[in-house]
């Protein structure tokens, strides 16, 4: 893992380099796309980006949890949560990238 975090500015820079829009237009495009995704999620709509992922808001019912230190039962309030489900295409890409990094990290076996 590289540990790098990709920011809005990184996305805008990538659009600038690959698409050819100006830096300002690239930043506006990234902001517009993110705003549209956020607005749809807030409205309770499912956002499905083919070959990438699905974002969805889910209602969780009230339930009983347990304090791990004391063992005491604690009610957990009902709430809405957002879920992110990676597509099979993305999952496959991640697995291939992981396998490739793992193979590169493995030292070559010297011939005996």
From Swiss-Prot:
InterPro entries: Hist_DNA-bd, Histone-like_DNA-bd_CS, IHF-like_DNA-bd_dom_sf, IHF_alpha. GO terms for biological process: DNA recombination; positive regulation of metabolic process; regulation of DNA-templated transcription; regulation of translation. This protein is one of the two subunits of integration host factor, a specific DNA-binding protein that functions in genetic recombination as well as in transcriptional and translational control. CDD domains: IHF_A (cd13835). GO terms for molecular function: DNA binding; structural constituent of chromatin. This is Integration host factor subunit alpha. Keywords: DNA recombination, DNA-binding, Transcription, Transcription regulation, Translation regulation. It comes from the Bacteria. Belongs to the bacterial histone-like protein family. Heterodimer of an alpha and a beta chain. GO terms for cellular component: cytosol. Signal peptide: none annotated.
């Amino acid at each position: 893992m590289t540990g790098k975090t990709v920011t809005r500015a990184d996305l805008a820079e990538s659009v600038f380099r690959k698409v050819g829009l100006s830096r300002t237009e690239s930043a506006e495009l990234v902001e517009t796309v993110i705003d549209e995704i956020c607005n749809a999620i807030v409205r309770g709509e499912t956002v499905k980006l083919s070959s990438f992922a699905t974002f969805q808001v889910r209602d969780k019912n009230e339930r009983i949890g347990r304090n791990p230190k004391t063992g005491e039962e604690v009610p957990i309030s009902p709430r809405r949560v957002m879920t992110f489900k990676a597509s099979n295409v993305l999952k496959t890409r991640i697995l291939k990238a992981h396998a490739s990094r793992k193979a590169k990290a493995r030292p070559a076996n010297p011939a005996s």
